[in-house]
C-alpha cells in the first residue's frame, strides 16, 4: 500500500530585500509504501528540508501534489488540505523530528511527552503510563524525566524529541537531519531508535548528511541531484 506519493512538487521563496525569487525544489516525484524507510540525499541547500516541511505543511507548496493515505480521511492532498485537517494529522498521524528542540521553557521532559498525548484527548492516567513507556523505550535516563531540557546534551534532547513525536504512534514519521552535530555514540543510539521504529512498522522519510549512517536502514533512496529514486538491495542503491 502506498502511504505517501509526491508528484511534481515545487516550492519557491521570495527574498524581498533583493527583489529575487529562488526555486527551492522543482518537479520532485517519489512514493513510499507503508512500513518503508525512504532516505533523501543531496548537498546542503538542495531542498531536502523543504520537501519534509512541505509534507508536514510547515511550508505551503506552490505546485504539485502530496497524497497521503490517511487513516481518518483516506487519500488526501496535503497541499489542498484544510488547516483543521492538517492540525488533526499532526496530532494523530504524522510526526516530525528535527535536530532542534523547540519547547516551552520551564516544562519538564515528562510533561512535554505527556502533553503530546493530552492534546490527542488521552486521559491523564493513560498519558502518564504511555509517557513512561516511551521514555524507557528510547532509553532516556529516568533521572532526567522531571528535569528541564535546557540542561540536556544534544543526544538527550534528540531522544526527547523522538519520544514526543512517536508517543502518539504516528503512521508517518519525518526525520529532518536529526543526527546533525551529534557525536558518534549519540548517532549509534539514534540508529538503534530508528531500527526500533522500523520494527514497529512506522513509515519513515528521513534526511541524513552521513551516507554511512543510512546504510542498512533505508529501503529506498531519493537523490536530489538526479531527481531519481532507487531501491536499496544489499546496501547498494539500484534504480527503481
Predicted regions and their residues:
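Q-loop/switch helix immediately C-terminal to the Walker
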Residues: 107-118
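The feature captures the beta-strand-to-loop junction immediately N-terminal to the Walker
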Residues: 41-43
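Conserved ABC ATPase signature
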Residues: 148-152, 156
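Helix-to-loop junction immediately C-terminal to a conserved catalytic motif
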Residues: 56
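ABC ATPase NBD Q-loop/coupling interface
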Residues: 65-88
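Catalytic Walker B motif of ABC-type/P-loop ATPase nucleotide-binding domains
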Residues: 173-176
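ABC ATPase C-loop
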Residues: 165-166
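Conserved ABC ATPase "signature" region
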Residues: 125-143
